[in-house]
Structure formats: structure tokens, C-alpha cells
């Protein structure tokens, strides 16, 4: 069986579970379950701490896992990044007290940086020629300055509300942009059939979220103009209608552009334009 690690908690957990469920995998029914066998899909799911997933995958104990791009880099393991999963977006930023003179990266020189990502911070500072001391903390990083443990922090930021509430302000350029990723053990063949099947399913889920089916009727002489507007992935499906002067068109279009495309199609003569959600795909 393909051994898949999924986050057992945190901001990545529920979107990861939902994505796997939409891809047809069986999830745990009891929150106390740590391992779930899914013989129909030839996989085992292991519910692990997000921080540990890259370590297990890098060691080859687990074949593949879902974790954050930032967590993967901070782990320093040999786990290989396979694909972005489209959720869990965040940035990794420096933050200092509101009244602190620390306002640029150069000001970090000689300072103590509270963080849960000490390797990532160390590598970033070294790359930029800054000599500072990362202080490893497992949680509540934003409290480290007030408690006198650090002069500033480096942490994952989604909205910035937590930092502002702690009297901290973001400064400098983002250290890193991150999102959820699928990672693979270096011991697993990248062409392993089970891995390829998993990736096809996850790509299918992403496509179903980002695209919709659009159906419309169009005068035959306007088909070329309509296809220019909605070319689809390979080519639209075009079918003749009872009235030979009209044709029916079915095509996949980006969900974010639906209304603009409907307007453009209407303007070239399309009528009866209908949009339908996609439940699943294989592209």
C-alpha cells in the first residue's frame, strides 16, 4: 500500500482531508484514529503532526505526505516536492515591536530572532550576510519579545491580526511564500503507478475547483468567434441542432472568468448560456 501522511491538526488539516475525500480516499471516522487503511485504493493514511511529516517522508518511512512548503524547507530533509495543492497560502515574515528601531533587514544584525523555523531563518540570514541568532520556539512565538527572549520574530503570517494584537509590526520583504504541497520520499520512484494515480486524482480535484462546464447555442456562422473566446483545453465539443443554422457548444472555462466569458459570448450571438459545476475530472 502507498503510505500517505496527512496533517492531524492545524490550518492545513481540514483542507487536506477535504481534498483527499474529494479524490475518493477513505478518511478516519474517529478523531483518535492515527492510521486508516483504504484497501480499495491501495493506500494507508497516517495522521501526523504537520512539523513531522517532511521528516518521515524524507527518511522513507512514509511514501508521500501533505505539508507546507515552509515546513518542508525548514525540515532540511531529502523529501521531494511533487505538486502545489492550492490551499494553505501564507507568507513568512519578520516582525518587531511597534516602537522598535528595527525597520530593515540590516537592523537584524546581532539580534535574537524568535521563531519556530530556525533553519529557514538561519539560511535566509546567511544568504543575505546578516549575523543574528535564531531562537527556536515551538509555539506562541509572538510572545517571545515581550518575555525578553527575543528582539524580534520570524513567523508565518496569514492576516497579521495575531501580530498586531501582540504589538508587533511586519517589516522588510517576505522571507518566503508558502502553500500546501504534496511531497515524495526519495526512495519512492517518481513514476510509481500508485503515486501517479494519486497525483492525477489531486490534479482532478484542483481542476474541478477552478473550472466549470459552459453550454451554449450559437449560430453556425459565429462558431469560430465563439471558439476564439472559449477554446477549452483541447477543443470545445460542437454538436448540430435540429435547426441547421445553430449549433450547441460545450466547453470547460475558468470559474473566475465565467461572467466575462458569458458577456463576450452573448455579444457574438450565443444564447441559452448555462454554467454547470464540475464534480470530478481526469485531464
UniProtKB/Swiss-Prot annotation:
PROSITE patterns: ATP_P_PHORIBOSYLTR. InterPro entries: ATP-PRT_HisG_long, ATP_PRibTrfase_cat, ATP_PRibTrfase_CS, ATP_PRibTrfase_HisG, HisG_C, N-reg_PII-like_a/b, N-reg_PII/ATP_PRibTrfase_C. It catalyses: 1-(5-phospho-beta-D-ribosyl)-ATP + diphosphate = 5-phospho-alpha-D-ribose 1-diphosphate + ATP. Its main location: cytoplasm. It is an enzyme of class 2 (transferase). This is ATP phosphoribosyltransferase. Keywords: Amino-acid biosynthesis, ATP-binding, Cytoplasm, Glycosyltransferase, Histidine biosynthesis, Magnesium, Metal-binding, Nucleotide-binding, Transferase. Catalyzes the condensation of ATP and 5-phosphoribose 1-diphosphate to form N'-(5'-phosphoribosyl)-ATP (PR-ATP). Has a crucial role in the pathway because the rate of histidine biosynthesis seems to be controlled primarily by regulation of HisG enzymatic activity. Belongs to the ATP phosphoribosyltransferase family. Long subfamily. One of its GO terms (cellular component) is cytoplasm. It comes from Bifidobacterium animalis subsp. lactis (strain AD011). Feedback inhibited by histidine. Its cofactor is Mg(2+). It is found in: Cytoplasm. GO terms for biological process: L-histidine biosynthetic process. Its EC number is 2.4.2.17.
Amino acid at each position: 500500500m502507498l503510505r500517505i501522511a496527512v496533517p492531524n491538526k492545524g490550518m492545513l488539516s481540514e483542507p487536506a482531508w477535504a481534498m483527499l475525500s474529494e479524490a475518493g480516499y477513505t478518511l478516519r471516522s474517529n478523531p483518535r484514529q492515527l492510521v486508516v487503511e483504504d484497501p480499495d485504493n491501495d493506500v494507508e493514511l497516517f495522521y501526523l503532526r504537520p512539523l513531522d511529516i517532511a521528516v518521515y517522508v524524507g527518511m522513507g518511512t512514509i511514501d508521500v505526505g501533505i505539508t507546507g512548503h515552509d515546513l518542508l524547507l525548514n525540515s532540511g530533509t531529502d523529501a521531494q516536492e511533487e505538486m502545489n495543492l492550492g490551499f494553505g497560502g501564507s507568507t513568512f515574515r519578520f516582525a518587531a515591536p511597534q516602537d522598535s528601531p528595527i525597520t530593515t533587514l540590516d537592523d537584524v544584525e546581532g539580534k535574537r530572532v524568535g521563531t519556530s523555523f530556525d533553519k529557514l531563518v538561519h539560511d535566509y540570514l546567511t544568504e543575505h550576510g546578516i549575523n543574528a541568532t535564531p531562537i527556536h520556539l515551538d509555539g506562541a512565538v509572538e510572545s517571545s519579545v515581550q518575555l525578553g527572549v527575543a528582539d524580534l520574530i520570524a513567523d508565518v503570517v496569514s492576516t497579521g491580526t495575531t501580530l498586531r494584537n501582540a504589538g508587533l509590526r511586519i517589516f522588510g520583504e517576505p522571507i518566503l511564500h508558502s502553500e500546501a504541497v504534496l511531497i515524495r520520499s526519495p526512495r519512492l520512484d517518481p513514476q510509481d503507478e500508485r503515486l501517479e494515480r494519486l497525483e492525477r486524482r489531486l490534479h482532478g480535484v484542483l481542476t474541478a475547483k477552478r473550472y466549470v462546464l459552459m453550454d451554449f447555442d450559437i449560430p453556425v456562422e459565429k462558431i469560430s468567434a465563439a471558439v476564439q473566446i472559449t477554446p477549452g483545453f483541447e477543443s470545445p465539443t460542437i454538436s448540430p441542432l435540429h435547426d441547421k443554422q445553430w449549433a450547441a457548444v460545450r466547453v470547460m472555462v475558468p470559474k473566475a472568468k465565467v461572467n466575462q466569458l458569458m458577456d463576450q459570448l452573448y455579444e457574438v450571438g450565443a444564447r441559452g448560456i448555462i454554467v454547470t459545476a464540475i464534480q470530478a475530472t481526469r485531464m
